[in-house]
């Protein structure tokens, strides 16, 4: 099975997502790894910086701005009211989740969870778009199979075994959409591969 990887610029707008969808729907089964939409991870880092500095007002301002941008992407990406609604609900749940971190202690652990949201959103958006187009696509959660060892290097045996389990849950899928950049560490905590580390 082919594995294709698209970085943030490739999925940086609704139009670019549609172009990627055309490229990947050629009748062959494949796993498609997506980054966050371009600029998203940097913005999430900026939000995290405000939270480290105990400035929830600054963080919320940037969160609201980013959410508005995503609502526009949703409007441009989907053609039907049903999928526009699904997309808006998706965005709301992720941004409400990010906002929940403005109220409590913020550490490196919370930052890693916040940074993971970009990939989780972009892959869910693409999965919905493919489904709206009638493609049998499935979201493969990277957090269920992607793990690093105690040296922060990918754990190939674990990854292969767990990925196989995930694939077997959806034998009829044509396209498997999954996240780059995010993983769990050797202790099961949400972690991030190094920037560019999705190439693993």
What are these regions (language model features)?
Residues 1-200:
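Nucleotide/pyrophosphate-binding catalytic subdomain
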């Amino acid at each position: 099975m082919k594995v294709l990887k698209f970085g943030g610029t490739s999925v940086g707008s609704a139009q670019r997502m549609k172009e990627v969808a055309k490229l990947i729907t050629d009748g062959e089964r494949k796993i498609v790894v997506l980054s966050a939409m371009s600029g998203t991870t940097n913005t999430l880092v900026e939000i995290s910086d405000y939270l480290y500095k105990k400035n929830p007002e600054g963080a919320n301002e940037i969160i609201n701005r980013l959410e508005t941008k995503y609502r526009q992407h949703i409007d441009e990406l989907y053609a039907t009211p049903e999928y526009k609604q699904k997309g808006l609900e998706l965005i709301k749940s992720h941004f409400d989740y990010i906002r929940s971190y403005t109220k409590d202690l913020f550490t490196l652990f919370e930052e890693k969870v916040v940074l993971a949201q970009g990939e989780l959103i972009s892959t869910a958006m693409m999965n919905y778009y493919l489904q709206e187009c009638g493609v049998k696509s499935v979201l493969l959660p990277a957090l269920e199979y992607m793990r690093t060892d105690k040296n922060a290097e990918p754990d190939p045996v674990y990854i292969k075994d767990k990925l196989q389990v995930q694939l077997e849950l959806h034998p009829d899928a044509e396209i498997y959409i999954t996240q780059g950049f995010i993983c769990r560490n050797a202790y099961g905590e949400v972690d991030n591969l190094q920037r560019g580390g999705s190439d693993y």
